[in-house]
């Protein structure tokens, strides 16, 4: 298949995820819509083209991992996994209801395909880093992808993990920073400015930083992941 055809398929997949995300949140009547919507194109690229996963065997040891450190984007992950066949997508319409397998924040003990329970911001980044190190020590040829919010980057734990990942040369770890400019209490720059930018901080720790002009463009996201794959010795 030509690249242009692949990209068009990913755009369609992203639109399908958007629709299902809105249905999922709508079933509850409220939820984290913007924080879910802002990661959908990246999820479409990962699950539509990039990641090694098996819906029939969610715990396959050689799978790629995807961690939502910003766990409140759970509805987007549920829509993505449902469309990939991990479960009937309509099951997610029980979002945050009693006895549901789809809490508002992702939970690996409840939802097939979810690799890590998240919600307390910063901890997903740290655990994803540990998973990447563990996979490397075990000799697995896989990657760990982690989504971190720009507001989440106020957490010191994010930067401890960033330093750790660079020190141990975890080139099997790829971090997406969802730089959507807003967090719960308002504009990110008003709550806690990151000086020269979040990318500059990761660069200072020794990461290979790739900044996109449009984080909702599936082709730019796909190309960035390929560049990250080609980088050796740096997360």
Predicted stretch roles:
Residues 1-145, 211:
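Thiamine diphosphate
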Residues 52-59, 63-65, 105-235:
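Glycine-rich ThDP/TPP pyrophosphate-binding loop and its adjacent helix/strand module
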């Amino acid at each position: 298949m030509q690249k242009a055809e692949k990209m068009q398929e990913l755009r369609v997949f992203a639109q399908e995820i958007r629709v299902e995300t809105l249905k999922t949140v709508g079933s509850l009547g409220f939820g984290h819509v913007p924080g879910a919507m802002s990661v959908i194109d990246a999820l479409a690229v990962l699950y539509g083209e990039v990641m090694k996963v098996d819906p029939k065997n969610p715990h396959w040891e050689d799978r790629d991992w995807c961690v939502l450190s910003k766990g409140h984007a759970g509805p987007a992950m549920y829509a993505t996994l449902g469309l990939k066949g991990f479960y009937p997508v309509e099951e997610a319409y029980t979002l945050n209801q009693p006895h549901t397998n789809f809490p508002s924040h992702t939970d690996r003990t409840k939802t097939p395909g979810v690799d890590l329970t998240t919600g307390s911001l910063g901890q997903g980044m740290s655990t994803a880093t540990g998973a990447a190190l563990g996979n490397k020590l075990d000799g697995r040829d896989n990657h760990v992808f982690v989504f971190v919010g720009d507001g989440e980057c106020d957490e010191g734990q994010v930067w401890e993990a960033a330093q750790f990942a660079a020190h141990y040369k975890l080139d099997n770890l790829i971090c997406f920073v969802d730089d959507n400019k807003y967090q719960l209490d308002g504009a990110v720059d008003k709550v806690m400015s990151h000086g020269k930018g979040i990318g500059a901080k990761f660069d200072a720790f020794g990461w290979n930083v790739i900044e996109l002009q449009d984080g909702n463009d599936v082709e730019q996201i796909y190309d960035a992941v390929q560049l990250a794959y080609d980088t050796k010795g740096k997360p």
